Every structure is written in structure tokens, then in C-alpha cells.
């Protein structure tokens, strides 16, 4: 299993392609953006939230009073399309942009993100920390991550927040070993994002996990 603890760039791109395929099927808006020379690229998603005392998703599911899920189970339950927020005008809309890149140094995916109000005002690191749910904030301080920091986007050359990848292999190894033990197929990106995403307000619809199981059953 040692060779599976890290992933190569081609394997990363294959996992991303599988992930984006399901995203397109459910309208989750993830897409692949190639670099200028098309030698590499990254996954991207833009997400809007309402800031009005509590943070709400663009479909109107309030996170006020939310409970902390185990990191390996932090998937988003499906929402009804009719749950559209009608009070947006009286609130502040925040635009979140999430990028998933491959780290050649660590041989794992890395989550970059930035956030701003619709008038262009960026959120500061302090704002980002205030938006992290308390249970995830404690886990950030204790590990397996160092912390949220600000770095230059390796492809765009612009400032982004990032969850440092130095401990990714450490918390992903048990996931991979357990999946091998029970002979279960997993998409690395799906499992990894379900762990790190909720820390910065990014929850995956549960259907991603189901899609992986379905793909496994369809393998001849």
C-alpha cells in the first residue's frame, strides 16, 4: 500500500476527471481549467453564500446550529432547488472560489481558495478564521493540518488562501488502507475533499460517495 499513499499527476487528473463527470451530472459546477500551455491545470468551483448573522448556502440551507460531522462523513445532504434565498438583498453575499491543484512537491492535491464580497472587497485571514466552524477550528489548530495560510497561486500568480498539504498523506493513508482492507474502490479526490472541504465551508453532496460505489459495481 506504500506506493498508493501518494498519487502522481496523471492519477490526480484521472481522479479529477471522474469527479467532474459526476459534478456535471448533478449540476455541482466543478470544472477543469487548463494552464496556458495546457500541460497541467486545476479543478475550480465558484460558490455564493449569504452572510446574515449565520452563513447560508446559495440554495438557502442555513448552517446556523449545524453539528460537526466526522471528517470522513462530511458530505452535504441534497437540497431542494426551490429553496432559493429571498432575503439576499438584505444580506451580504460572499463569493467563494475553490481551486484543487496538484502539488508536485508533496504528490497530493491541495485546496486553494479565496473569498470576497460582491463589491470586490476581499475577506481577510481573520474573516476566514471567523467563518470556520468551532469544531473544525480546533482540529485545524491541533492537526492534521498546520493552519490556513495565504500563498501565491502557482498557476495564476495571485494571492489565495491554502490548506497546507504537508499532513495530507498522514490523514489520507488510513482512508486508503481501510478501503483496500474492505476491497472498496474510492476516488482520492472525493475522500480528500470530504475531509478538508468542510473546514472552509465546502461540503460535497452525498451522491459523490454513492457515485464511487456505483462505478465500482459497474467494473466488469
Curated annotation (Swiss-Prot):
Source taxon at top rank: Eukaryota
Subcellular location: Cytoplasm
GO molecular function per UniProt: Atg12 conjugating enzyme activity; Atg12 transferase activity
Enzyme class: transferase
Primary location group: cytoplasm
Keywords for this protein: Autophagy, Cytoplasm, Protein transport, Transferase, Transport, Ubl conjugation pathway
GO cellular component, one term: cytosol
Entry annotation: catalytic residues: 166 (glycyl thioester intermediate)
EC number: 2.3.2.-
InterPro entries linked to this entry: Atg3/Atg10
GO terms under biological process: autophagosome assembly; autophagy; ER overload response; mitophagy; protein modification by small protein conjugation; protein transport
Assembly and oligomerization: Interacts with MAP1LC3A. By interacting with MAP1LC3A, it plays a role in the conjugation of ATG12 to ATG5. Also able to directly interact either with ATG5 or ATG7. Interacts with IRGM.
Described purpose of this protein according to its UniProt entry: E2-like enzyme involved in autophagy. Acts as an E2-like enzyme that catalyzes the conjugation of ATG12 to ATG5. ATG12 conjugation to ATG5 is required for autophagy. Likely serves as an ATG5-recognition molecule. Not involved in ATG12 conjugation to ATG3. Plays a role in adenovirus-mediated cell lysis.
Family: Belongs to the ATG10 family.
Protein name: Ubiquitin-like-conjugating enzyme ATG10
Organism field: Homo sapiens
Amino acid at each position: 500500500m506504500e506506493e498508493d499513499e501518494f498519487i502522481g499527476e496523471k492519477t490526480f487528473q484521472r481522479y479529477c476527471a471522474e469527479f467532474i463527470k459526476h459534478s456535471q451530472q448533478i449540476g455541482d459546477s466543478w470544472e477543469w481549467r487548463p494552464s496556458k500551455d495546457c500541460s497541467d491545470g486545476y479543478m475550480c468551483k465558484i460558490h455564493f453564500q449569504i452572510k446574515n448573522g449565520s452563513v447560508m448556502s446559495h440554495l438557502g440551507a442555513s448552517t446556523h446550529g449545524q453539528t460537526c460531522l466526522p471528517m470522513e462523513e462530511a458530505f452535504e445532504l441534497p437540497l431542494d432547488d426551490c429553496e432559493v434565498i429571498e432575503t439576499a438583498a438584505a444580506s451580504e453575499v460572499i463569493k467563494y472560489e475553490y481551486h484543487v491543484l496538484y502539488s508536485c512537491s508533496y504528490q497530493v492535491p491541495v485546496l486553494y481558495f479565496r473569498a470576497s464580497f460582491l463589491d470586490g472587497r476581499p475577506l481577510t485571514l481573520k474573516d476566514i478564521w471567523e467563518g470556520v466552524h468551532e469544531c473544525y477550528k480546533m482540529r485545524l489548530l491541533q492537526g492534521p493540518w498546520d493552519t490556513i495560510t495565504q500563498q501565491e497561486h502557482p498557476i495564476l500568480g495571485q494571492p489565495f488562501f491554502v490548506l497546507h498539504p504537508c499532513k495530507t498523506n498522514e490523514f489520507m493513508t488510513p482512508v486508503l488502507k481501510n478501503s483496500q482492507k474492505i476491497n472498496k474502490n474510492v476516488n482520492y479526490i472525493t475522500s480528500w475533499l470530504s475531509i478538508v472541504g468542510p473546514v472552509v465551508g465546502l461540503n460535497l453532496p452525498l451522491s459523490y460517495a454513492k457515485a464511487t460505489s456505483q462505478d465500482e459495481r459497474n467494473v466488469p
